[in-house]
């Protein structure tokens, strides 16, 4: 079966995210969110938080947490939900309520319950590449990320800044601009 996922980049600083969990998996999820969107508004709810999870999230002023059981009202005003506990029945309950409310939900280690996945990310300057294996092998995605981090030049930001300046200087209709940009970037393709 083909990978039918649609890759999008979300402005998490304009959305409200709920993470249910406070352990290792929750730390992995929230750190992935905050590494990519340090201004993300995140609320975490869990009956227990690991000390390293608390130490990490306390660096981010827009992240709040509550040490208690999940309540259905925690979904009020949320846009995204991440379930990151070891409590499968709780995940199923949260997913069902989120679906009723048309909220997108990620359930750790349960691809069948996920509306979206947190992909492996490569970032150099303004260049950001998300890698998906359709939930089949996060380990492979991490290996591909490491490869891309190594082969993408460190000066890629300078290249992008130059291309942006060139694009902004172009006159004419959209098709003429695309043609000019394709011409100047054709040398950037990698061929064996």
Feature locations, PLM:
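Glycine-rich, highly charged phosphate/nucleotide-binding loops
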Residues: 58-76
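Hydrophobic, well-ordered beta-alpha structural blocks that scaffold small-molecule cofactor pockets
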Residues: 1-56
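ADP-ribose/adenylate-binding Rossmann-like module
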Residues: 80-86, 91-117
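Structural motif
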Residues: 16, 79-80
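Short loop/edge segments at beta-strand edges and connector loops
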Residues: 46, 65-69, 109
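E1/E1-like adenylate-forming module used to activate ubiquitin-like modifiers
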Residues: 107-157
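Residue-level detector of alpha-helix initiation sites
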Residues: 24-25, 89, 135
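An accessory alpha-helical subdomain
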Residues: 135-192
């Amino acid at each position: 079966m083909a990978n039918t996922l649609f890759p999008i980049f979300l402005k998490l600083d304009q959305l409200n995210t709920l993470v249910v969990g406070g352990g290792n998996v929750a730390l992995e999820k929230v750190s992935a969110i905050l590494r990519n969107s340090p201004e993300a508004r995140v609320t975490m709810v869990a009956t227990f938080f690991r000390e390293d999870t608390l130490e990490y999230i306390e660096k981010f002023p827009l992240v709040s947490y509550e040490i208690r059981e999940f309540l259905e009202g925690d979904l009020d005003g949320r846009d995204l939900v991440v379930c990151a506990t070891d409590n499968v029945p709780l995940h199923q309950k949260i997913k069902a309520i989120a679906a009723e409310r048309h909220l997108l939900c990620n359930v750790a280690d349960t691809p069948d319950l996920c509306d979206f996945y947190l992909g492996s990310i490569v970032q150099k300057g303004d260049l950001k590449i998300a890698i998906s294996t359709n939930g089949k092998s996060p380990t492979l995605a991490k290996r591909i990320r490491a490869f891309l981090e190594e082969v993408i030049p460190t000066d890629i930001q300078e290249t992008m800044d130059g291309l942006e300046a060139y694009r902004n200087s172009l006159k004419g209709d959209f098709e003429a601009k695309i043609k000019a940009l394709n011409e100047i970037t054709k040398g950037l393709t990698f061929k064996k």
